[in-house]
């Protein structure tokens, strides 16, 4: 108060007032403070001060032609005086208003294209539904999540090249667009952004949002796909949650989801084949997800899931160093151990050989519905702090931790024999045997574990053997916490190796993953998964096997035709015929195979009986090990649609129907492709078959006498030449071969040579 009074007194004296209001500021320190550097020191003040002036804006001289000097109200929009120190014009804020109302308009067509991610977000929110708000304790755990819906999965470098190519196509600098997705995106964007007037830098920023996955390590309770993360601030607080259903899906979430399903299916299928690793690679390379090659997606997509990581390891890609056990991701946070083989006895006196981890270690365990911190010593659980969504999830985590601890009381709790097998009917390793056993029934395990009184610790509570919470007692060493355990945040990737049984190890030889860890959960993929590998045909049931087998034969008919005549045994052993065998009734397989093979042999031996359609139709039946019998069949049975359906040996049936007019084959009513019979198979086909064993030398040569009919040919001696009458009354010169070995190629060359000789 005192100082204000003093100031008032001072201001009342006109000389002081003059000094305070008119004198220039010439104190060096003050001048320095406000003038050094480009950074504005007091932007708010500067803005107020500028806007209080009549002409706070400067503009290019051209503005004088584009804007009138005065607006409709007669207010001046720009001053004729030049801006000091530049040749720009001083402009009033009113000019901006005039420009916005009356200035030129530009096309808005590119805005939705450039700001695509925002426009799509608005649509999702518009169509999303927000449900009620619930107040309850939120168990949030930090997970690495995708915060940018609707992106492609390019690496930063790949995206940079695409952006440079699209936005600054004429800039110098080496840009190599290699991947399929890079090329597709570049082409698409160049077309979309033709004649785009939006500032290139803006376009570049927005393209980056569209092309690159951005992840953050955020506390989440609930959905982790990017369409949930974009509304995280609306759906979960510290003590509340709001139900939300997104108003649309985005491709990146669909890719992640479909990739997991494809990888699980492939790993499960590979496990049961003779060489799992080779099969897995073959399937990964021949599978497409939403029209993009699975191997390209695996290289770019950071999804961490057991099956996906096994596929990545097989391709030689780096994966996370954490390991998986019982569906939980374990990350060692401190301590170390050495491994030693040890024999232990179960409660049923069965001997198990387990690899014991000797030493003190601490782990974080993260699962879909529960998380935990585990401290253990050699074959002893010291402490487990677990949190989860519900009783069931907490129990799952406790079982996994108890088995992982390798404690004796756990092994002694086994009742009955352990003989669990995997899909390929091989016994599981001892640790997974124990896990499966207790996952089925953990009552004895929990009863035998032992309980202890507990101290009252904030946020912690005990849990009894029947999985009910308790404040005084708890299972030995085990506590339930309100707080979740964060997922391992590091994105570090390590080099791993994989053996032919798909066990993935780090460089120290620790097993990180194995097919036993792959979830059995079935889901429906959001994007179309196309498995081109014959190993995956059975995934969609018997009909798919049938259609795929015939489609494969038709696609490869040229190669098959040659093998059919030259090396049938090799053809019958092709793995593409394996799935088909499961459709043929077990009792009939060998008989059918013997019958068809004999029939084919007759076709090879007896002239004029080569029949493309029949060979294609019966070929899959010849793949089973044959039984030599004299049995004849007029139809062969396949088990589809829940019952036996017949394939007629001669003629069409609902299973196999060839339309001669359209030259198309339908299998169970589905189109299986177009089939070109050997040209004019009725005649030329017969001739090419007949002329096997004969070399066509060219046009008719009168020196070799009158033309013989095809039937008279059989009387020629080896090496003898003759004219022969074929098809439409044309005559060609042939010679009977001296050796039988080359007979096989004749059918193919005969047709071509007949044409050449005639023309």
Swiss-Prot record:
Belongs to the influenza viruses PB2 family. The record marks 627 as: Avian adaptation. It is found in: Virion; Host nucleus. Influenza RNA polymerase is composed of three subunits: PB1, PB2 and PA. Interacts (via N-terminus) with PB1 (via C-terminus). Interacts with nucleoprotein NP (via N-terminus). GO terms for biological process: 7-methylguanosine mRNA capping; cap snatching; DNA-templated transcription; symbiont-mediated suppression of host gene expression; symbiont-mediated suppression of host mRNA transcription via inhibition of RNA polymerase II activity; viral RNA genome replication. It comes from the Viruses. Keywords: Cap snatching, Eukaryotic host gene expression shutoff by virus, Eukaryotic host transcription shutoff by virus, Host gene expression shutoff by virus, Host nucleus, Host-virus interaction, Inhibition of host RNA polymerase II by virus, mRNA capping, mRNA processing, Viral transcription, Virion. This is Polymerase basic protein 2. SUPFAM superfamilies: PB2 C-terminal domain-like (SSF160453). GO terms for molecular function: RNA binding; RNA-directed RNA polymerase activity. Coiled coil: none annotated. Pfam families: Flu_PB2_1st, Flu_PB2_2nd, Flu_PB2_3rd, Flu_PB2_4th, Flu_PB2_5th, Flu_PB2_6th, Flu_PB2_7th. One of its GO terms (cellular component) is host cell nucleus. Plays an essential role in transcription initiation and cap-stealing mechanism, in which cellular capped pre-mRNAs are used to generate primers for viral transcription. Recognizes and binds the 7-methylguanosine-containing cap of the target pre-RNA which is subsequently cleaved after 10-13 nucleotides by the viral protein PA. Plays a role in the initiation of the viral genome replication and modulates the activity of the ribonucleoprotein (RNP) complex. A motif (Nuclear localization signal) lies at residues 736-739. Disulfide bonds: none annotated. Its main location: virion.
């Amino acid at each position: 108060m005192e100082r204000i009074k003093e100031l008032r007194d001072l201001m009342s004296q006109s000389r002081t007032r003059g000094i305070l209001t008119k004198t220039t500021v010439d104190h060096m320190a003050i001048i320095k403070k406000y003038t050094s550097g480009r950074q504005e020191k007091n932007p708010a003040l500067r803005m107020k001060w500028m806007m209080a002036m009549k002409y706070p804006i400067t503009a290019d001289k051209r503005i004088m032609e584009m804007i009138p000097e005065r607006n409709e109200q007669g207010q001046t929009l720009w001053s004729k005086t030049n801006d000091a120190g530049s040749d720009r014009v001083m402009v009033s804020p009113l000019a901006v208003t005039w420009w916005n109302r009356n200035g030129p308009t530009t096309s808005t067509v590119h805005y939705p294209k450039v700001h695509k991610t925002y426009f799509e977000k608005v649509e999702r929110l518009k169509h999303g539904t927000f449900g009620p708000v619930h107040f309850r304790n939120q168990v949030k755990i930090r997970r690495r999540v995708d915060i940018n819906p609707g992106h492609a999965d390019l690496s930063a470098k790949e995206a940079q090249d695409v952006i440079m190519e699209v936005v600054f196509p004429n800039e110098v600098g080496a840009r190599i667009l290699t991947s399929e997705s890079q090329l597709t995106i570049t082409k698409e964007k160049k077309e979309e952004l033709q004649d785009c007037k939006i500032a290139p830098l803006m376009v570049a920023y927005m393209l980056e949002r569209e092309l690159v996955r951005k992840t953050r390590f955020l506390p989440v309770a609930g959905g982790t796909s990017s369409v949930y993360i974009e509304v995280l601030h609306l759906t979960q607080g510290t003590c509340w949650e709001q139900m939300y259903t997104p108003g649309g899906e985005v491709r990146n979430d669909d890719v992640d989801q479909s990739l997991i399903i494809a990888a699980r299916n492939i790993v499960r299928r590979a496990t049961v084949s003779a060489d799992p690793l080779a099969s897995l690679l073959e399937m990964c390379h021949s599978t497409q997800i939403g029209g993009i090659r699975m191997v390209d997606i695996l290289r770019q997509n950071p999804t961490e899931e057991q099956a996906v990581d096994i596929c990545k390891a097989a391709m030689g890609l780096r994966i996370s160093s954490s390991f998986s056990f019982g569906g939980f991701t374990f990350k060692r946070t401190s301590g170390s151990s050495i491994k030693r083989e040890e024999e232990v006895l179960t409660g049923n006196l069965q001997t198990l050989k387990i690899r014991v981890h000797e030493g003190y270690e601490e782990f974080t365990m993260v699962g879909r519905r529960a998380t935990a911190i585990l401290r253990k010593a050699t074959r002893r659980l010291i402490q487990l702090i677990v949190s989860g969504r519900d009783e069931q999830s907490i129990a799952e985590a406790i079982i996994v931790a108890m088995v992982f601890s390798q404690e004796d009381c756990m092994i002694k709790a086994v009742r009955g024999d352990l003989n669990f097998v995997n899909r390929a009917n091989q016994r599981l390793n001892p640790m997974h045997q124990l896990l499966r056993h207790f996952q089925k029934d953990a009552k004895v395990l929990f009863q035998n574990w032992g309980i202890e009184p507990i101290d009252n610790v904030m946020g912690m509570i005990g849990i009894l053997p029947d999985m009910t919470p308790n404040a005084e007692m708890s299972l030995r060493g085990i506590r339930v916490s309100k707080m979740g355990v964060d997922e391992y945040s590091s994105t570090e990737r390590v080099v791993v190796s994989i053996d032919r049984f798909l066990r993935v190890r780090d460089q120290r030889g620790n097993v990180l993953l194995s097919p036993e860890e792959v979830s059995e959960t079935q889901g429906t993929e959001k994007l179309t998964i196309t498995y081109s590998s014959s190993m995956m045909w059975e995934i969609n049931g018997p009909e798919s096997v049938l259609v795929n087998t015939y489609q494969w034969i038709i696609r490869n008919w040229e190669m098959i035709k040659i093998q059919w005549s030259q090396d049938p045994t090799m053809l019958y052993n092709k793995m593409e015929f394996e799935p088909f065998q499961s459709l043929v009734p077990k009792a009939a397989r060998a008989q059918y195979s013997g019958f068809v093979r004999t029939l084919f042999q007759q076709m090879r031996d007896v002239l004029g009986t080569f029949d493309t359609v029949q060979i294609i139709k019966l070929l899959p039946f010849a793949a089973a090990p044959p039984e030599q019998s004299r049995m004849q069949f007029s139809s062969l049975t396949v088990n589809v649609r829940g019952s036996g359906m017949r394939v007629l040996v001669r003629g069409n049936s609902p299973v196999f129907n060839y339309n001669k007019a359209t030259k198309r084959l339908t299998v169970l009513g589905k189109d299986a492709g177009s089939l070109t019979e050997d040209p004019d198979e009725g005649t030329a086909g017969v001739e090419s078959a007949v002329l096997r064993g004969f070399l066509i030398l060219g046009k008719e040569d009168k020196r070799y006498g009158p033309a013989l009919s095809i039937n008279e040919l059989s009387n020629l001696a080896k090496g003898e030449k003759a004219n022969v009458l074929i098809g439409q009354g044309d005559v060609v010169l042939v010679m009977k071969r001296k050796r039988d070995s080359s007979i096989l190629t004749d059918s193919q060359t005969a047709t071509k040579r007949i044409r050449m000789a005639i023309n």
